[in-house]
Regions:
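Short, well-structured beta-strand/strand-turn elements
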Residues: 129-141, 268
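Short, solvent-exposed loop/turn and secondary-structure capping segments
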Residues: 43-45, 96-99, 118-119, 152-154, ...
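Middle-to-C-terminal accessory/interaction subdomains
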Residues: 28-29, 39-41, 63-67, 75, ...
Length: 570
């Protein structure tokens, strides 16, 4: 009896729908959905049966006579302009051959994003990088039960499927021989919806998206939980930065770097609160992505203003940032992020984003006008920071943020990069100044004695030619044309017979007293001047700041890298 009643309802709805005229509202496609009996959609859990008509850019109408629709989202479900999830009876290639063939699709309202395009721009950013799976962004006008609801974005459902997250689908049902090493799709989910667990080391809330809640069995649950627990243990270990024993052996570095850079470039304050990552079968690595849920990114939330000059690892929500902050303390990761960010900028990432924004703005011009006739363009929906009177102002604000924040990130990333060791000195055909690290005064001469003197522009006695001689260098004064020399008399050695003032003498490449090694020290660009004959180090006497203080042949020991009297900037 229920089946007969349902069939009658389907027929009645189909007759009502057939009486409608399906035309485009603007230059975009228009989606018409009619629920059976005009039943309202009031739940994120319970589907309502419906029909759909899709009017494409050429005015061709495709009818779908049986699908289901329900609400979706967390905070966004509470907005007046609501997002939806639709599920077809059969798999449909809704967005063409280059996109997924699937039953489930999303209709994003982008209600809190006055530009309407933050999610789409972020997906395009992912395409520019190495990220494999980037959600669709097809903009349409949406009519539900005869009521125009505005501009919407058709996008993929986050699921394991070809042309979505394309990892191996596990056996269903599992067999004794089944490989349960993958695939898995996971989400860091601050809301803890569905099949979730919290990690023990960093307290990260993780939802197992795939295998589905109704399909996953205990062995799969145990496997992926242990895998993540082991990853965290390694990340938190003493050997975490070891390339073989540490976390690097557990992550795909390219997807990790690109996902993280996208999170920072968009300034997504929820980037570590809601994060997708996945593991494939017979693959030991974790992969990051897809990028999802960026409508409050790009400085669009009053709870976290000022993101233009903030790193999300310091400023954003979510426990995953503790993973990334731990990685930042590994010099390898810091170099990876700096190198990859430079590569993306050099490849034209920001210009690419500006061009995509311009194209989308032109595409949405008529649709956004209609959308804001209904919803109002200067009404606060959620936590928007700025309210403007025109759509173009929101677009300009978005582009300005990308321009200024992308530039700021260069410095922010560079500041987190570990200082590089001072490189070996490679002399050129120049005159050099040799400056003491403690006093910032220059190596100079007084008569034939070597002293320090205030660094003075045009003072030729402070200019030195550093001339390669085999494995050593001669250091020849420009004004006197005399070579730096260690005149120590008697027995010599690193700590023997120290304290003689250095002098300058006629250049002689055969004299070991005139041959020096410039020994790199630390990361600040300083060197020791090591004499090849005495094995002594050039040292500022007593650390005095006075002009004409003598430079001595002095102790060569473990303090070479820390005593500023012995350190020189060239």
């Amino acid at each position: 009896m229920k089946r007969k009643a349902l069939a009658i309802l389907f027929l009645f709805t189909a007759l009502v729908a057939s009486a409608q005229t399906y035309v485009r509202k603007t230059n975009l496609p228009t989606v018409y959905i009619n629920t059976f009996g005009n039943v309202p959609i009031t739940s994120k859990e319970t589907y309502v049966y419906a029909t759909m008509h899709y009017v494409d850019e050429n005015d061709a109408v495709t009818a779908y006579d049986s699908l289901q629709i329900r609400g979706r989202g967390n905070s966004t479900w509470g907005f007046a302009k609501k997002p939806y999830r639709i599920k077809f009876q059969d798999k449909e290639r809704l967005l063409g051959a280059d996109r997924a063939k699937a039953k489930s699709w999303t209709l994003l309202a982008n209600a809190a994003d006055k530009s309407l395009i933050r999610n789409a721009v972020t997906s395009l950013m992912g395409e520019f990088t190495s990220l494999k799976f980037n959600p669709a962004a097809k903009f349409v006008d949406f009519v539900l039960n005869g009521n125009y609801l505005g501009n919407y974005q058709i996008s993929d459902q986050m699921e394991v499927r070809k042309r979505r997250v394309d990892v191996v689908e596990q056996d269903l049902p599992l067999l004794d021989t089944s490989d349960i090493s993958g695939g898995y799709l996971l989400e860091v989910d601050g809301f803890m919806d569905g099949n979730c667990f919290t990690t023990s080391t960093y307290s990260v809330p993780i939802r197992i998206v795939y295998p589905d809640d109704e399909d996953i069995v205990a062995s799969q649950n145990q496997y992926i939980k242990k895998y993540i627990a082991d990853f965290e243990t390694v990340l938190n270990s003493r050997d975490y930065a070891d390339p073989d024993k540490g976390y690097r052996a557990w992550v795909d570095s390219m997807s990790l770097a690109d996902w993280y850079i996208c999170t920072e470039l968009t300034a997504n304050i929820d980037g570590f609160w809601s994060t997708y990552f996945y593991k494939d079968q017979a693959d030991s690595l974790l992969y990051w992505g897809p990028l999802w849920d960026y409508d409050i990114a790009y400085n669009n939330d009053t709870r976290k203003p000022g993101t233009k000059t903030q790193l999300m690892t310091d400023y954003g929500y979510g426990q995953t940032k503790e993973w990334i902050n731990r990685m930042w303390s590994d010099p390898w990761f810091a170099k990876l992020i700096n190198r990859r960010y430079t590569e993306l900028l050099d490849a034209g990432l920001t210009d690419y984003l500006y061009n995509k924004i311009d194209s989308l703005t032109e595409l949405l011009q008529r649709s956004q006008e209609l959308n804001y006739q209904k919803w109002g363009i200067n009404k606060r929906v959620y936590h928007e920071i700025v309210l403007y009177s025109s759509y173009d102002q929101y677009i300009a604000d978005l582009k300005t943020f990308i321009s200024e924040h992308s530039e700021w990130l260069k410095t922010a990333f560079a500041q987190k990069k570990p200082a590089e060791p001072t490189p070996p000195f490679s002399p050129g055909m120049f005159y050099y100044r040799i400056i003491n690290a403690k006093t910032a005064k220059g190596l100079d001469i007084q008569g034939t004695g070597v002293v320090q003197y205030a660094n003075t522009e045009g003072r030729l006695s402070q200019d030195w030619h550093i001339k390669p001689v085999g494995d050593y260098v001669q250091i020849i004064n420009r004004d006197a044309n005399l070579a730096l020399n260690d005149p120590t008399i008697g027995n010599v050695g690193p700590t023997v017979n120290i304290g003689t003032q250095l002098n300058v003498v006629a250049p002689d490449e055969e004299s070991p007293r005139q041959l020096w090694t410039l020994v790199p020290q630390g990361t600040a660009g300083y060197y020791n001047l090591l004499n090849s004959y005495t094995q002594h180090i050039a040292n500022l006497q007593g650390g005095s700041a006075n002009d004409y203080t003598s430079i001595l042949s002095y102790t060569n020991d473990s303090r070479n890298g820390s005593s500023t009297n012995r350190l020189w900037y060239i």
